[in-house]
Swiss-Prot record:
Source organism of the structure: Halalkalibacterium halodurans (strain ATCC BAA-125 / DSM 18197 / FERM 7344 / JCM 9153 / C-125) (Bacillus halodurans)
E.C. number(s) listed in UniProt: 3.2.2.9
Protein name: 5'-methylthioadenosine/S-adenosylhomocysteine nucleosidase
SUPFAM superfamilies in the record: Purine and uridine phosphorylases
UniProt entry tagged with the keyword Amino-acid biosynthesis: yes
Metabolic or biological pathway, per its Swiss-Prot or TrEMBL entry: Amino-acid biosynthesis; L-methionine biosynthesis via salvage pathway; S-methyl-5-thio-alpha-D-ribose 1-phosphate from S-methyl-5'-thioadenosine (hydrolase route): step 1/2
GO CC, any one term: cytosol
GO BP terms in the entry: L-methionine salvage from methylthioadenosine; L-methionine salvage from S-adenosylmethionine; nucleoside catabolic process
Record keywords, A-Z: Amino-acid biosynthesis, Hydrolase, Methionine biosynthesis
Purpose: Catalyzes the irreversible cleavage of the glycosidic bond in both 5'-methylthioadenosine (MTA) and S-adenosylhomocysteine (SAH/AdoHcy) to adenine and the corresponding thioribose, 5'-methylthioribose and S-ribosylhomocysteine, respectively. Also cleaves 5'-deoxyadenosine, a toxic by-product of radical S-adenosylmethionine (SAM) enzymes, into 5-deoxyribose and adenine.
Amino acid sequence: MTKIGIIGAMDEEVELLKSKLSNCSERTIAECEFYTGTIEGKEIVLLKSGIGKVNAAIGTTLLIQLFQPTAIINTGSAGGLDSSLHVGDLAISTEVRYNDVDATVFGYEFGQVPQMPAFYQPDDMLIDIAIEAAKTVGIPSKKGLILSGDSFMSDAALVEQLKRRFNYPLCSEMEAGAIAQVCHRFGVPFVIIRSLSDIAGAEAKVSYDEFLETASVNSANLVLAIVGRLG
């Protein structure tokens, strides 16, 4: 039976998904909250990991080791970097990179953790399913690069630097890189789904405060559509 791991960082990002779980049971380990149950007959392990890369890595490792999911979907909000995307729109990962790692003095690419890949490749089948599912939720979507780092992108100069440094990033957020790296190490297929709560830059916090719930619901609705298409 397919067992799908779904990861969100905050209450807002898992609330809708938790409400859809049948026969839900809860377990907390190292402050990571796990909710197990079913959605549309599929076995689900929903994790609220906490915010940031280390929390995400801890939670993802526990999820894989304790529950052995066949695939992992990461859901949540992000700050937009692509001018064609608007608040509430959806981003589907085709690659994931860190935006706050610099070992270039040793010949690595910017964003590349030493001895690790320069970027992390989501599962092709999950990407295709996400793209098809996005057509049914009535929200504009785009596939591409998602950046990840332990900073909220409210510095306009830093945002412009990231846009110059990376090729056409869709958005930036704070957990996906760690989740992708852990999935890579364990060989678990994954895809990252984000909805924009803000446009990264000086006004990002104001938008984030207003639209976090909208972004969280939009991302969760796409995850539900993906779950419905998984075998």
